[in-house]
Amino acid sequence: MEGIRRAAQRAAEEFLQAFPMAPGSLFVLGGSTSEVLGERVGTRPSLEAAHAVLEGLLPPLLERGVHVAVQACEHLNRALVVERETARAFGLEEVAVFPHPKAGGALATAAFLRFRDPVMVESLKAQAHGGMDIGGVLIGMHLRPVAVPLRLSVRKIGEAVLLAAKTRPKLVGGARAVYTREEMLKKLEEFLPKPP
């Protein structure tokens, strides 16, 4: 389990290095502990593996002031575990259900047991700024547009494939639009007074 914890920690640290999430941002985690242990999703939930993943992933995110949502499995319609303050901050609707390893999954159950004041919410309303998918459980529905894959050097947590994504604001405008501060400043040069 120590290897799982270390891999999760490295993944979180690398994620935050590639995409420095601001305090108050929302991170979504989805995962299958069965896949982490080399089994097919849903066949071998493990609270021990779930705790190892969370022990690695949560500290770097929480130290940065990032809100974390942990997705439950399809038996709970992919509802998520969040802190009550996260639900309030993002206007999320609480639902009346408690996860357990066979309905919700081990990762959501472990998060519910670990969080200070956990609640289940139906959806993130596509407000997550970034996230990780451990084992191909699909988190895209929770991410803001536009999702951008992040390629991390940590490719697996245990035996589960690790996918990560950040998001960026939509690019708007037409032929005259610019998309970086540097481009904007260059365009301004023609409007600045010329020295005599």
Curated annotation (Swiss-Prot):
InterPro entries: Antibiotic_NAT-like, DUF436
Spans through the membrane: none
Leader sequence segment: none
Residue ranges of coiled coil: none
Pfam families in the cross-refs: DUF436
SUPFAM superfamilies (alphabetical): TTHA0583/YokD-like
Family assignment from sequence similarity: Belongs to the UPF0340 family.
HAMAP family, A to Z: UPF0340
Record's protein name: UPF0340 protein TTHA0583
